[in-house]
């Protein structure tokens, strides 16, 4: 965000102030199961839930720039982009089950033109 000029200042200070929240207002992903946004607690009591083999979750970083955000250059306003993967937790680590889905600009444009 700093490199693009959307935020100004030191990265450490911007993170400390949660300045990125203007562009990314939710978490990195969610459970995936019988429903697109499957239910389940992310914490058990005060502890984060330990991932177990067979659990499926999304990893979906993105940027969302409001049309009304006058703190950024006009060329950025109204843009939203997200790259999403679906991941299965395995005994050995994880399996990205959407690894073959197009993600680059060129791949996506070729798919759309087909």
Locate predicted features.
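Active-site cores enriched in adjacent His and Asp/Glu residues with nearby glycine-rich loops
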Residues: 1-32, 55
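Charged, cofactor-coupling segments
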Residues: 21, 29, 34-114
């Amino acid at each position: 965000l700093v490199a693009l000029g959307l935020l100004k200042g030191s990265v450490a200070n911007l993170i400390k102030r949660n300045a990125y929240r203007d562009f990314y207002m939710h978490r990195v992903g969610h459970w995936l199961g019988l429903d697109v946004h499957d239910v389940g607690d992310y914490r058990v009591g005060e502890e984060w839930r330990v991932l177990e083999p067979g659990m499926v979750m999304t990893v979906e970083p993105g940027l969302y720039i409001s049309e009304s955000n006058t703190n950024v250059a006009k060329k950025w306003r109204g843009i939203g982009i997200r790259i999403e993967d679906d991941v299965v937790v395995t005994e050995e680590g994880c399996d990205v089950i959407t690894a073959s889905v197009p993600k680059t600009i060129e791949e996506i444009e070729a798919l759309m033109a087909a």
